């Protein structure tokens, strides 16, 4: 799997509806949160974040906590909260330095940040060039 494709997964609406229909249990809440993180709807991703944060704050189960932190980082990355995502992954990697999933996700998030940052600079540069061209054209028209 291409590292960046980690960020591009999505959940079908049927999966979300099925997860919502399950009885309320810790395991089902985690499953629901995970499918919500894969939603195309930002509100559902945010709902997934809320569920995961509740589970993490209430957990004595380190495995559940690890999974939840991983999906929290993924959710924040999907919402373009890259700094929050990187901070969560760094915290996870401090406790589990050999966690390859977290390492790959951090690499994908950093790559996406870099590309979008460069893209943002390119768009800004293009906008400056257009405005500069309009100013020059306006000055030339005046003469």
UniProtKB/Swiss-Prot annotation:
Keyword Mitochondrion annotated: yes
Top-rank taxon: Eukaryota
GO cellular component: mitochondrial outer membrane; peroxisomal membrane
Membrane topology: Single-pass membrane protein
Example GO biological process: peroxisome fission
Signal peptide as annotated in the record: none
CDD domains given in the database record: Fis1
Keywords: Apoptosis, DNA damage, Membrane, Mitochondrion, Mitochondrion outer membrane, Peroxisome, Transmembrane, Transmembrane helix
TM stretches of this protein: 121-141
Statement: the UniProt record of this protein carries the keyword Amino-acid biosynthesis: no
InterPro entries for the chain: Fis1 (IPR016543), Fis1_cytosol (IPR033745), Fis1_TPR_C (IPR028061), Fis1_TPR_N (IPR028058), TPR-like_helical_dom_sf (IPR011990)
Disruption outcome: Mitochondrial connectivity appears normal, also normal in a fis-2 mutant background. Modest but consistent increase in the number and size of clusters of protein lgg-1, perhaps representing abnormal autophagosomes, in a fis-2 mutant background. RNAi-mediated knockdown inhibits removal of ultraviolet C radiation-induced mitochondrial DNA damage.
GO MF annotation terms: lipid binding; molecular adaptor activity
Pfam families with a match to the protein in the record: Fis1_TPR_C, Fis1_TPR_N
Intracellular or extracellular location(s): Mitochondrion outer membrane; Peroxisome membrane
Family from the record: Belongs to the FIS1 family.
PANTHER family, per database record: FIS1-RELATED PROTEIN FIS-1 (PTHR13247:SF1), TETRATRICOPEPTIDE REPEAT PROTEIN 11 TPR REPEAT PROTEIN 11 (PTHR13247)
Known role: Involved in the fragmentation of the mitochondrial network. Involved in perinuclear clustering of the mitochondrial network. Plays a role in removal of ultraviolet C radiation-induced mitochondrial DNA damage. May act, redundantly with fis-2, downstream of mitochondrial fission, before the fission products participate in either mitochondrial homeostasis, mitophagy, or apoptosis.
Record's comment describing the protein's domains: The C-terminus is required for mitochondrial or peroxisomal localization, while the N-terminus is necessary for mitochondrial or peroxisomal fission.
Protein name: FIS1-related protein fis-1
Species annotation: Caenorhabditis elegans
Lineage: Eukaryota, Metazoa, Ecdysozoa, Nematoda, Chromadorea
The encoding gene: fis-1
């Amino acid at each position: 799997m291409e590292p960046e494709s980690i960020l591009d997964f999505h959940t079908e609406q049927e999966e979300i509806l099925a997860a919502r229909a399950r009885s309320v249990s810790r395991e089902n809440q985690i499953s629901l949160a995970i499918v919500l993180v894969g939603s195309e709807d930002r509100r559902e991703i945010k709902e997934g974040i809320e569920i995961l944060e509740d589970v993490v704050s209430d957990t004595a189960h380190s495995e559940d906590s690890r999974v939840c932190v991983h999906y929290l980082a993924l959710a924040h990355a999907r919402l373009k909260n890259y700094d929050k995502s990187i901070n969560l992954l760094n915290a996870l990697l401090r406790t589990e330095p050999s966690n390859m999933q977290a390492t790959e996700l951090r690499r994908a998030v950093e790559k996406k940040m870099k590309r979008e940052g460069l893209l943002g600079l390119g768009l800004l540069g293009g906008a400056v060039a257009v405005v500069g061209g309009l100013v020059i054209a306006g000055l030339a028209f005046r003469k």
